[in-house]
């Protein structure tokens, strides 16, 4: 990837987002976590739970290989803040953002810039049980800086997550469905009718190491042919929870192979991630 001034600006902006979220989190919770209030395995379990009570700021970098007719390289930096709120003694609200910064090869318009932003809000009962679920709306904001890395559409729909914690294992499914409902002038391509399916299973160890197998499958229901409809990667990652001064964080590395993708889609990818984590205020 060619590191441009825009790339450095995006990285600085991402760092600012992380610092603001960390600074706004309760200092007492941070002290308790660093002092052992939650051990590494418990933090690892919460990181594997998409709707846990952690304020987290993942910086996820993906290298997608085999993109376009020339089998080029696409890089995607996803910033994915997760902020939970307790709205009543029995209910939590968890807000999740996905803010991508994309660099595409020349065969796909050689575009680099901010992609569409996705916001999800889950309402989850605070039952204290091993079966956890949450449901709510998901919205895509057409904030892309280049038409080639965005849909040009406002989209919305439902989202759902269901998971089970069984000892050291966590397994479940995150799902959403998006339909476009408004168009950005002169930038729209086609209407959005897209499903997202993320089944996952994670094995957490007392050391804070987590082994995860998951998929982030996308179904383009408007695709003209079956071969263009599905994008199905199988991803395997290893992550480790540790501390940086008073703050716990996680590092992750992994790879994925695409068992199905459109003709212009990738063949395989590499992933690294760094996640700042902080327990939310009780």
List each language-model region with its residue ranges.
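Cleavable N-terminal export/targeting peptides
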Residues: 1-39, 281-282
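Transmembrane beta-barrel domains of Gram-negative outer membranes and organellar outer membranes
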Residues: 29-282
């Amino acid at each position: 990837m060619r590191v441009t001034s825009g790339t450095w600006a995006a990285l600085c902006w991402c760092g600012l987002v992380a610092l603001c979220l960390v600074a706004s989190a309760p200092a007492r919770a941070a002290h308790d976590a660093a002092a052992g209030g939650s051990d590494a395995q418990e933090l690892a379990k919460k990181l594997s739970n998409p709707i846990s009570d952690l304020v987290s700021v993942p910086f996820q970098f993906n290298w997608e290989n085999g993109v376009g007719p020339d089998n080029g390289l696409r890089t995607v930096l996803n910033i994915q803040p997760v902020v939970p709120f307790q709205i009543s003694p029995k209910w939590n609200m968890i807000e999740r953002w996905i803010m991508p910064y994309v660099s595409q090869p020349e065969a796909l318009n050689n575009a680099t810039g901010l992609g569409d932003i996705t916001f999800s809000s889950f309402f989850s009962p605070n039952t204290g049980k091993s079966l956890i679920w949450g449901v709510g709306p998901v919205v895509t904001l057409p904030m892309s800086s280049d038409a080639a890395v965005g849909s040009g559409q406002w989209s919305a729909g439902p989202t759902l997550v269901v998971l089970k914690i069984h000892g050291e294992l966590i397994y479940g499914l995150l799902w959403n469905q998006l339909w476009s409902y408004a168009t950005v002038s002169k930038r729209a391509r086609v209407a959005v009718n897209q499903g997202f399916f993320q089944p996952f299973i994670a094995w957490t160890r007392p050391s804070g190491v987590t082994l995860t197998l998951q998929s982030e499958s996308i179904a383009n229901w408007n695709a003209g042919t079956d071969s263009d409809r599905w994008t199905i990667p199988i991803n395997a990652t290893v992550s480790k929870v540790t501390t940086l001064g008073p703050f716990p964080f996680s590092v992750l590395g992994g790879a994925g192979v695409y068992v199905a993708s459109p003709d212009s889609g990738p063949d395989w990818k590499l992933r690294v991630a760094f996640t700042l984590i902080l327990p939310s205020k009780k």
